[in-house]
Amino acid sequence: MEMRRFYILILAAVALLAGCDSVGSDERLIEIPPATVQRNVLIEDFTGQRCIFCPAASQTIEELQKLYGADRLIAVGIHAGPLAIKSMGGVKGLRTDAGDVYYKYWAVPNVPKAIINRRGGVLPKDTWAGRIYEEFAQTTTINIALQCHYDAATRQVKIETNLKTLSEDVKGRLQLWLVEDSVVAPQLFPNNKMDKEYVHNHVFRAAINGEWGTELTLSSMRTHVEQTTYTLPEGVVPGNAWIVGFVYNDSGVLQVVRQKVSLS
């Protein structure tokens, strides 16, 4: 009896399959997700050597970089505004004219503040982690490859930037920045404590191709190549220097990468 019931179930299943409308291979809808590449995140950290709360903000960024990786969460410390200082009278200052341009353009009210992927406005420290998490959840179709060739005799670095989009054409700008790690310079702490040998990392040094970069249009049909030759400013240590490159437009930063200037 059990065997007979089994055969009846098999026959019923065959009948159901025979009643299904066959779909040809050329009629099936196959959803193909859009191609994407690994998304990195840029945090522009507005800071100053006379800002007593800025060292703690820098520590927060370092902890977030340990979580995500320093090549994925790319930090740039922009010394600007009234609490930043320029070099004078034997005191090493990290403030730059380009940094002041950004400080004014983004209407930074005070420091420490940050802009993350140039979306969401100027943010206080306690919101950084959440905003960074949200940005990593986004996707991008932009691929950037940076190559640096440094000549110690001339202090010139040749920068080759290869860019491509995996989808429709993208209009934007390529920005190249010089950033330096392990910069020893004074820093003020709470209770007006001054550390004259404080080590500053990811310090913004210069906008290599101008404050707002180079206008370009990326196509999925070809790789866009930019060649740039730049002379390192006096005082910048080649072994501590990085080139940060990113593509941005009105929607924010689409992709960011970094590359060491010299591996020696």
Regions found by a protein language model. Give the residues of each.
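Bacterial Sec-dependent N-terminal signal peptides
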Residues: E2-R5, V14-L42, F46, I52
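Short N-terminal helix-initiation segments at or just after the protein's N-terminus
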Residues: C20-G24, A57-S58, P190-N191
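Intrinsically disordered, low-complexity boundary segments flanking structured domains
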Residues: R28-I30, I61-K66, Y102, G130-E135
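Local sequence-structure signature of Cys/Sec-based thiol-disulfide redox active-site neighborhoods
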Residues: P33-G81
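Short, conserved sequence motifs used for protein processing/export or organelle targeting and
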Residues: D71, G77-S264
